[in-house]
Amino acid sequence: MIERGKFRSLTLVNWNGFFARTFDLDELVTTLSGGNGAGKSTTMAAFVTALIPDLTLLHFRNTTEAGATSGSRDKGLHGKLRAGVCYSTLDVVNSRHQRVVVGVRLQQVAGRDRKVDIKPFTIQGLPTAIQPTEILTELVAERQARVLSLPELKERVEAMEGVQFKQFNSITDYHSLMFDLGVIPKRLRSSADRSKFYRLIEASLYGGISSAITRSLRDYLLPENSGVRKAFQDMEAALRENRMTLEAIRVTQSDRDLFKHLISEATSYVAADYMRHANERRIHLDSALVLRRDLFSSRKQLVTEQYRHVEMSRELAEQSGAESDLETDYQAASDHLNLVQTAMRQQEKIERYQSDLEELTYRLEEQSEVVSEASEQQADNEARAEAAELEVDELKSQLADYQQALDVQQTRAIQYQQALQALERARALCQLPELTADNAEEWLETFHAKEQEATESLLQLEQKLSVADAAHSQFEQAYQLVVNIAGEVSRSEAWQTARELLRDWPSQQHLAERVQPLRMRLSELEQRLRAQQDAERLLQEFCKRQGNAYQPEELEALQRELESQVEELSLSVSDAGERRMAMRQELEQLKLKIQELTARAPVWLAAQDALSQLSEQSGEALEDSRQVTEYMQQLLERERETTVERDEIAASKRAIEAQIERLSQPSGAEDARLIALAERFGGVLLSEIYDDVTIDDAPYFSALYGPSRHGIVVPDLSLVREHLQGLDDCPEDLYLIEGDPQSFDDSVFAVEEHEKAVVVKIADRQWRYSRYPEVPLFGRAARENRLETLYQERDRLAERYATLSFDVQKTQRTHQAFSRFIGSHLAVAFDADPEAEIRLLNTRRGEIERALNAHEDQNQQQRQQFDQAKEGISALNRLIPLVSLLLDETLTDRVEEITEELAEAQEAARYIQQHGVSLTKLEPLLSVLQSDPQQHEQLQESYVLAQNSQRLAKQQAFALTEVVQRRAHFSYTDSAGMLTENSDLNDKLRQRLEQAEAERTRAREQLRQYQSQFTQYSQVLASLKSSYDAKRDMLKELSQELVDIGVPADANAEARARARRDELHAALSTNRSRRNQLEKQLTFCEAEMDSLQKKLRKLERDYHQIREQVVNAKAGWCAVMRMVKDNGVERRLHRRELAYMDGDELRSMSDKALGALRLAVADNEHLRDVLRLSEDPKRPERKIQFYIAVYQHLRERIRQDIIRTDDPVEAIEQMEIELGRLTEELTAREQKLAISSKSVSNIIRKTIHREQNRIRMLNQGLQAVSFGQVKSVRLNVNVREAHATLLDVLSEQQEQHQDLFNSNRLTFSEALAKLYQRLNPQMDMGQRLPQTIGEELLDYRNYLELEVEVYRGADGWLRAESGALSTGEAIGTGMSILVMVVQSWEEESRRLRGKDISPCRLLFLDEAARLDAKSIATLFELCERLEMQLIIAAPENISPEKGTTYKLVRKVFQNHEHVHVVGLRGFANEMPSLPPIAAELQQGG
């Protein structure tokens, strides 16, 4: 017997009060005992969370919230956890003895919503020695541990060999694995399934009779019969499809003639237009090719003319360029001549200005000397006038002083004072402290002598200074000349530089004299160089035209070669005419042959189309008429063989259908009469009792019962005896077996099992040996397996029958097609292909035309070569005389050498011209530069000192004279003497004043005269300087202009320039004559090109026009061809015989078909619109779209499952054959598919009966359950009255309601709903559809009502309601119901899980204090009998004697809260207690 799986332990990590706690679970009952808040509910919540980790369902409320619709926000889970990572795991050992740890990682999510994050996971293959806490925690110290995170846990588990860790992102996957491993009793596929499971656990946890479960007991206890519903749905879908197909066949039959007419006219309409466009496209392509050939030939001719034009244009451009160059050179030469003449005139001006400057220089020097002398005299006169002025002023002052002192004493005193002042002034000025009035006269003579001596010294210095000035001016003149010639030099190096300049002067003069000979030589060489360059240019042009590079020495041999080539080309051109004539004659013959074959082609093509259709139909390559007749005989033989095989297949198919019908009987009865007999006898078919036997056990039971496996089990055979009398409608052998149908087993037989056989001892003297059948049919699974095989075989035979029927009809139609072909096309069908011959002839014609074109091109090329050779000879005639000049390689070097010498000579000439006069002046002054008169400055300084000494001497003499004159004033000691002396002095002063004024007047007059004379001299000097500066500036400008002109200014240069100009004028005239000649030739060439371009433009216009038509047609044609190929209608539209009809005939054919189509599609809006659009002649693709639309319309109208082809044309051919056969077959199929209402009633009744028996079996397990006054619990199953009436009507009175079930407009479900409404008119169905109501009526669960009843005291059987029971009784009753539900789920899911898996059974019970000891003992007994585990929570005063009990005490130590747990293994006499579980690990950190 399979051992049931068990939960071994529950582990809580980091829960509130439980840091790392593992609860070992008892095999029966585990009791959590403790006071309020000890952690009992927390432990159960951890178990439930690990079992169902769905936050949408979890809600842990205490009993005070039992009826509340909303509890705390966290639904009781957030507050049970501690911060950080938390775990809840279940250690399970299943029926296969596999250890599985399933659990969840929980973690509080920060926020006001107090959410919890849950991640389910599983660990498989964990060794038994390892506890879950060892995996989930890590020791940090001796009494400290750390909780691992989920990634760390995964890493630790995966490091263990053979241990698998799996994390789940979906609760469905988590529960799927738990179901496969036998942890949960039912596969939880959806959230609704999880909700049912949670509601069951919740009802178990909180105890009592859960209204959520009792109201939905049908959903919890009764399995959904999805197979029956699906069978009904498939049957209805098949019937619906069958009816739709039959309706489509009827419509198709009515439209058959329309289809034929539509496809025929559409093919004519579109194919005619299709081939007309194809013909026009081919014609346009041929025209475009002809125009393109003419265009290319014209372009080639134009290219030739353009080449000639380009060559002549190039030569003309070269001549024009040369002319432009010559004109430029001529203009340059003329300009050069003008420049030379200008330079000559400029040189004359320069020479004239140089002579004027020399004269002005001489006059300027003379005038400078005169001005210098006048300046000196002016200075002397100014000094005398100043002295006279001073003397007059002094005398006037003295006289005024004396006149003011009319008082004698006063006057004398003043005079005495003035005399003393004069004496002091004389002492200071003469530096004579010993001077007195007595010795003043002596000193006056001395100082008069000094004055005379200073004057004489000044005159001597003036003479020396004049001589030094003359020498200094010569040195400065010479030095300035050297600086002008050689640039800045020092005064000490001036003589050496001047001597070198005078030494180089003769060589420069010699070079300047060579300018003219060198120019003449250079002119000759340049003329020869230009001739050489012209010859090289002619050679380059010749090489360019010839396309090869030739050396000058090769030209004579080339001339001889070109002359021979001209002779050969003249001979080859003469032979071209004869060949051209022969090719044209052959071309005309080919055209006549092509016309003849074109007339034969349409008849041959029609025969080939018919032959190709026959080949496609037959699959044979028909190469001659003999094969055609032989194949007709083969068709007749094949038709006979196929007909025989078809009849055989039909017989086999009928036999299989009969077998299917027999196996499809309800309850497995092979004969439908057995079902009626079983109802009549009040028994049950044996096959119905064993209907649930597995397919593996079916062979054994089939052999065990042998022929009696189709017998009827009745409770009492004696009651059946009277029914057997007069029994006629029954099988030949009817087996009746006595037994209880509810508890029937196979113990009535004595059986011995053998290999694939059994021996049954029927009696002491009668044994039966039965082998296992190869195809067992006992039991629903075996029958369904056999039916599936038979269905496949029937479908295969049906397909084969349809194929054979189609082949017969196809063979008949193929034979008719062969007959028509022999009568119409056999005479011409096997002739040679005229189109192939036409293609060959067209190929030959193309070759001849290409040969003609090539011949014309070759002839034209030869003519061009002939002309080119003649031009080459002409050019060589000009080049050969110039070969010696071309070979002169030193000419350029000589020109460069002479050019350099001429540049040196011109430079020397310019030097002589610029500095010749200066060198001439410098030559006589060379000796002056040897000594620099530096003493001139010292002499000037001495002269200035002498002037100052003379002026001082004059002032000293004047001061002494004044003292001498006032000498009498020193004797004024008394007033009389003073008056007398004053009168004399006044007279003397007046006399002296008159003399001084006269002297002053003379000095002024003389100063005015000298000033006037000095002004005149200065003006003359300024005028000379201005004239000198102007002429010098003009000379510089003229010299600069001459330098800017850049040409030599000599007579030979003018002659050379004039000769060069005349030479260029002659060359220009020659070039212009050649240019005029080229322009005339170019005009003729351009006229020819214009005519060719006009022709070319016309050809291009015509070509582009027709090419545009071709391109547009191609774009449309490509779209047309793509549409044609994509839709597979090319074979229908491309009718080659139409290619030989002209456009008018095809257009007429298309128009006629269009008229017929308008009438044919008048009632079809879509086709009418598409046809109207297709009439646009510019959009040929729309006709194809119309044809495709017609095909699509026909495909839609012709069912592809009826007609086995995608081509509507072939479908029309098959329609007449296939539609009749399908109509007959589908009608029969509908009759077979239609299920009778009686059969439906029987299926539902049998299902209800089977479920009632299953509920009775479940009730047997609850009969001994008692809680308080409740002595027993049972589940009552009843059929609803309205639904029972429906079943009776379906089975007994179905003939009265055939209007519903035989209606083609109603499905069976809808008919069933209508019948239900008819039987229960008082019921309001609301807005639900009949289809929905009918589908509900096909579900047997809707026919049943389930109620829980309890047997309580004197009241007997009562409906289990919480109000009628005590709390303990309600808890016990609810637990009983939950056990029944779990058992039902296990049986329902038995087929879905492995046969070696018996799932775990575990329920909860919180707050077990409401149960008395007897009730708790009853729970223990129930758990032991049902192999169920139970976890109950009880107060401290309850300690069951059996099972495992955990004492929970919550303690607080150092602000840390933990639960102290002690475990006991019962305390009855026979059960020794377990030692206390070790204290839990202290909380880490």
From Swiss-Prot:
InterPro entries: MukB, MukB/SMC, MukB_hinge, MukB_hinge_sf, MukB_N_dom, P-loop_NTPase. It is found in: Cytoplasm, Nucleoid. GO terms for molecular function: ATP binding; DNA binding. SUPFAM superfamilies: P-loop containing nucleoside triphosphate hydrolases (SSF52540). Keywords: ATP-binding, Cell cycle, Cell division, Chromosome partition, Coiled coil, Cytoplasm, DNA condensation, DNA-binding, Nucleotide-binding. Residues 337-480, 509-605, 780-805, 835-915, 977-1116, 1210-1235 form a coiled coil. One of its GO terms (cellular component) is nucleoid. Residues 666-783 are annotated as: Flexible hinge. It comes from the Bacteria. ATP binds at residues 34-41. One of its GO terms (biological process) is cell division. Its main location: cytoplasm. Belongs to the SMC family. MukB subfamily. Homodimerization via its hinge domain. Binds to DNA via its C-terminal region. Interacts, and probably forms a ternary complex, with MukE and MukF via its C-terminal region. The complex formation is stimulated by calcium or magnesium. Interacts with tubulin-related protein FtsZ. HAMAP family: MukB. Plays a central role in chromosome condensation, segregation and cell cycle progression. Functions as a homodimer, which is essential for chromosome partition. Involved in negative DNA supercoiling in vivo, and by this means organize and compact chromosomes. May achieve or facilitate chromosome segregation by condensation DNA from both sides of a centrally located replisome during cell division. The hinge domain, which separates the large intramolecular coiled coil regions, allows the homodimerization, forming a V-shaped homodimer. This is Chromosome partition protein MukB. It comes from Yersinia pestis. The gene is mukB.
